[in-house]
Amino acid sequence: MIRFDKPIGTYLLLAPALWGLIIASEGLPTPFLVFTFIVGAFVMRSAGCTTNDLTDRKLDGFVERTRNRPLVTGEVSVIEALCLLFGLLGLALWLVMQINWLTVQLSFIGAALTIVYPFMKRFTHLPQVVLGMAFSWSIPMAFAAVTATMPAGLWWLFLANLL
């Protein structure tokens, strides 16, 4: 469910975070923030995959690409998957609490986007917009982590990443 063997999702989540950190810090983010965002990207990508697997578990058995996922095969129970999800979200919260209050506040929006995305596949033909917002949300978080503010210019980077 964490998908250690498919790191591209973590890289795609991490890239905007690093752009935000580098731009907000004018080229030299602290090693602490870089490390925290690297770990955070992995943890939140894993939480997103777990949420997606939980949400789609009744459909995944009908799709060739997803029919062998642990929830579909019974290798992992729903309770175990929920424990994993809450553990990942708890770890993400602990990580972000090491930064500053504005970043913590923004992280709740990021978590909400992560949790809502799989459900959007049922209600809209453009769930990728929500996924793009989730993947781009690390940009405002990075600016908040570096500057403890939300400068207006960060939204141009957010929009460029979203599109």
Show where each model-derived region lies:
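Membrane interfacial helix-start motif at the N-side
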Residues: 1-9, 73-75, 121
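The first (N-terminal) embedded transmembrane alpha-helix
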Residues: 3-23
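Short, hydrophobic transmembrane alpha-helix segments
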Residues: 20-32
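Loop-to-transmembrane-helix transition segments
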Residues: 31-38, 74
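Faces of alpha-helical transmembrane segments in polytopic inner-membrane proteins
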Residues: 156-163
